[in-house]
Amino acid sequence: LHMIHLHWYQYPPMNPMMYPLLLIFMLFTGILCLAGNFVTIWVFMNTKSLRTPANLLVVNLAMSDFLMMFTMFPPMMVTCYYHTWTLGPTFCQVYAFLGNLCGCASIWTMVFITFDRYNVIVKGVAGEPLSTKKASLWILSVWVLSTAWCIAPFFGWNHYVPEGNLTGCGTDYLSEDILSRSYLYIYSTWVYFLPLAITIYCYVFIIKAVAAHEKGMRDQAKKMGIKSLRNEEAQKTSAECRLAKNAMTTVALWFIAWTPCLLINWVGMFARSYLSPVYTIWGYVFAKANAVYNPIVYAIS
């Protein structure tokens, strides 16, 4: 109780119907996420032709999503059943740390996947191909930097506290001291605004490159007096473009998933009167959905 901010005491308990609904949602998404990401990891690791440097990033994305749901799913089921957090203050902090860690790792893995698509499509043969060593270094940097950021609240830079709905835990966005808020400013930049800027930059040039390629193909076809010009190289480029579209779709879905979390943090800092315990649930709903559809998009592609 000592970890719960006074802001939440002004609200009555949530409607009891919210808990079984949330439990059913978590059961559904938990099973789909764990099964989908496990299959993705198993297929990529046991199919030799798929063990490429680029696909190491896809496997890492599946691993981060799998770990997120593996660590979030059981505690959420327990808290929804009891209508409150019953796992103690220490596990509350561990729960929040693991959720932030896997989310941050997922975000930056998506960024590196996008950058790899940019390197393949925009730079083409002029770009340096992704090697297994480079992909491994990218993955290592993702986990090291994510751990560094997410472990900071254990040392007093912000704190991990129960959410207002008492079914989960996260960063403290209600404390007004500059130390706590500075963490949220920098962390929001690191896990949201910077990845968004990099992603937009990459896809602007990807779209330009695809448009220029298609225009060149049409112009060449006109000169040769034929309807279309599609050789083997063009088909390969077209396949790469389809992969880029799949990646773009996944990134867009990811930002839809994580924007509610950002808004909850910033509303909590600057307009807390608008933030009720029910609203904080939406951050869970959208974030957990992201871990479900990532393996679907990448497994198909």
From Swiss-Prot:
Glycans are attached at residue 165. The chain crosses the membrane at residues 19-43, 56-78, 93-115, 135-155, 183-204, 246-267, 279-300. A motif ('Ionic lock' involved in activated form stabilization) lies at residues 116-118. SUPFAM superfamilies: Family A G protein-coupled receptor-like (SSF81321). Residues 44-55, 116-134, 205-245 are cytoplasmic. GO terms for cellular component: cell projection; plasma membrane. One of its GO terms (molecular function) is G protein-coupled receptor activity. Residues 1-18, 79-92, 156-182, 268-278 are extracellular. The modification N6-(retinylidene)lysine is found at residue 288. Gene3D superfamilies: Rhodopsin 7-helix transmembrane proteins (1.20.1070.10). Keywords: Cell membrane, Cell projection, Chromophore, Disulfide bond, G-protein coupled receptor, Glycoprotein, Membrane, Phosphoprotein, Photoreceptor protein, Receptor, Retinal protein, Sensory transduction, Transducer, Transmembrane, Transmembrane helix, Vision. Contains one covalently linked retinal chromophore. Disulfide bonds join 92-169. Photoreceptor required for image-forming vision at low light intensity. Can use both retinal and 3-dehydroretinal as visual pigment. Light-induced isomerization of 11-cis to all-trans retinal triggers a conformational change that activates signaling via G-proteins. Signaling via GNAQ probably mediates the activation of phospholipase C. Homodimer. Interacts with GNAQ. Belongs to the G-protein coupled receptor 1 family. Opsin subfamily. This is Rhodopsin.
